[in-house]
Design a protein with these regions (language model features):
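Alpha/beta enzyme core
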Residues: 3-7, 14-43, 58-66, 79-203, ...
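A mid-to-C-terminal "edge-of-domain" accessory segment
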Residues: 4-5, 11, 250, 256-433, ...
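Short, ordered loop/turn segments at secondary-structure junctions
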Residues: 12, 47-48, 75-78, 105-108, ...
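Non-catalytic terminal/interface segments that mediate subunit docking, oligomerization
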Residues: 17, 27-30, 372-498, 502-507
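Hydrophobic alpha-helical scaffolding
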Residues: 21, 47-51, 120, 149-152, ...
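A glycine-rich helix N-cap at a beta->alpha junction
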Residues: 67-74
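Small-aliphatic-rich amphipathic alpha-helix that forms the alpha element of a beta-alpha
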Residues: 207-233
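Mixed-charge, glycine-accented linear interaction segment located at domain edges/termini
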Residues: 495-530
Length: 530
């Protein structure tokens, strides 16, 4: 087996074809710089000449000096009625300013005859002419054998002839593409084993995930000798996506012993994943292997007890190797080990002999039976654990009362309903009313609460707190409009983020609970810093 594999990232080209992914030119430049810092060998930047954005990207990248990565221009073989030297697409690759190009060509006779509408022999000449032309002008030319595995199944000898045509013309690497993503690993292994006997130049793998096998197929090809693996960060790609480099890289490094990236850069894998998610404006996938929030999250009490004693019992790698960390979840499935481990994470003094331990465990189980969920609301969980002790006093105890009232009205002059929230606080007989308008009752309530409280907690940063996310889930749908609901909110202050939760038959009351917890958690964090 190879001791190293070339990482070829196509996030900016194939990944950008994914539904809901839209990179600006600035985004593309930032992603390219991040991938270079991360240690990727090749960065496929797009198809120069096919659209203004990719043209502008390659223009901008002329000003960027990459440390180690090579920028790759992507394109297609020449058109059927043009010479390679006259083809606009091939000329655009040469004019892109980079020295490495990847072009795709037809491997499947069905596509040659029905899509390209030419003869099988002419397709071989198209491949040969295109590769040969680019080799005269560029240092490296990679040939993507589009639909190779489907083509091989339909007409094995012809599919191989397309590879040999590219090889004879000077292609530096023949990339076998499972373009439709339907090939099974056992079929891939059989086909790759056969074609290895016929080709002399290195080969690579480009797998799509339509059968949830892109990573498995990529690893299978590498075990059989592939020297280059194509993929995208987070598996972005058309339809069901491409092979996920965030899964391939740690599998190569930690399980197959293939040194495709440095240890230091491997520890930045989660950071890179989240960085690209942010630029793509997509949520982070909690259940993504290796780097997702749930990848090393433990919920069952027996599992937690075991993993604390020996992480190997329920963790296949050390989370920190990929920049992740273990999370202990507290729920109605929790045992004492969960509570103790979570308390240790939060620096809350708690031991097996602490009387609060049983109190906390019972409270968690009771609240979750009522519909509370603490897995996304660790701010509320920390407050719950502190309230179980005798030394914690809520900051809201200073108020003799803190009430709210909300009015929502639809007026002819307004295109949408507007809400007004009034918060009343009383301290030592002094009563203060504060009101705020908002786009909906919860937005108004949030504004009113944050408007009145800074007066009582000056210098504690409440002015910076913002509601980032708000989710409502109906827990007892059978009861219709009287159903119990759970509100989960995420708040942030520009530096940190935290989640809190509330449950009630009234969505506004559930929201109030979560908002109050959010403010109290912020005040708690600020007090600990000071």
């Amino acid at each position: 087996m190879k001791t190293t594999v070339q990482l070829y990232d196509t996030t900016l080209r194939d990944g950008a074809q994914a539904e809901d992914v839209n990179f600006s030119v600035e985004d593309m430049v930032r992603v390219a710089k991040k991938l270079d810092q991360f240690g990727v060998r090749y960065i496929e930047g797009g198809w120069p000449g096919s659209n203004p954005r990719d043209v502008e990207f390659f223009k901008e990248m002329r000003r960027v000096k990459l440390r180690k990565a090579k920028l790759v221009a992507f394109g297609a073989t020449r058109r059927t009625k043009l010479k390679a030297s006259e083809d606009p697409s091939l000329k655009a690759l040469v004019a892109s300013g980079v020295l490495t190009a990847t072009i795709y060509g037809k491997s499947w006779d069905l596509h040659v005859l029905k899509a390209l509408k030419t003869t099988l022999d002419e397709n071989l000449r198209i491949i040969s002419d295109s590769v040969a032309f680019l080799k005269k002008h560029m240092d490296e030319v990679f040939y993507d054998a589009e639909h190779f595995f489907d083509g091989y199944k339909a007409n094995a000898e012809y599919a191989i002839q397309t590879l040999l045509a590219a090889e004879a013309a000077g292609a530096d690497c023949l990339v076998l593409c499972d373009t439709n993503g339907g090939t099974l690993p056992n079929d891939l292994e059989r086909i790759v084993t056969n074609i290895k006997r016929r080709i002399k130049v290195p080969f690579g793998i480009h797998a799509h995930n339509d059968s949830e096998l892109a990573v498995a197929n990529s690893l299978a090809a590498i075990r059989l000798g592939a020297v280059q693996v194509h993929g995208t960060i987070n598996g972005y790609g058309e339809r069901c996506g491409n092979a996920n480099l965030c899964s391939i890289i740690p599998a190569l490094k930690l399980k197959l012993g293939i040194d495709c990236i440095s240890d230091a850069n491997l520890s930045k894998l989660r950071e890179v994943s989240r960085y690209v998610d942010e630029l793509a404006n997509l949520p982070h996938r909690k259940r993504q292997p290796y780097i997702g929030d749930s990848a090393f999250a433990h919920k069952a009490g027996v599992h937690v007890d075991a993993v604390v004693k020996n992480p190997l019992t329920y963790e296949h790698i050390i989370p920190e190797r990929v920049g992740n960390k273990r999370r202990i979840l507290v729920s109605d499935l929790a045992g004492k080990s969960n509570i103790l481990q979570k308390a240790a994470e939060l620096n809350i003094p708690l031991s097996t002999n602490s009387p609060e331990l049983i109190t906390i465990l019972k409270k968690v189980k009771q609240l979750e039976s009522e519909g509370y969920e603490f897995e996304g609301a660790e701010g509320s969980l920390e407050l719950l654990m502190l309230r179980a002790g005798h030394n914690y006093e809520s900051v809201f105890n200073m108020f003799d009362r803190i009430d709210y009232r909300i009015l929502t009205e639809r007026r002819k002059v307004d295109p949408h309903p507007v809400s007004e929230a009034t918060v009343t606080v009383e301290v030592g007989g002094n009563i203060e009313h504060t009101a705020a308008w908002g786009n909906g009752p919860i937005n108004a309530l949030d504004k009113a609460l944050r408007k009145v409280l800074p007066k009582y907690f000056p210098g504690r940063g409440l002015e910076n707190v913002r509601l980032i996310d708000y989710k409502v889930r109906v827990l007892t749908a059978a009861e219709g409009t009287a159903a119990r609901v759970r509100v989960l909110i995420e708040s942030g202050d520009g530096t940190n983020k935290w989640g809190t939760v509330g449950v009630s038959e009234n969505v506004i009351e559930a929201s109030w609970q979560a908002l109050v917890d959010s403010i109290e958690y912020k005040l708690l964090r600020t007090a600990k810093k000071n």
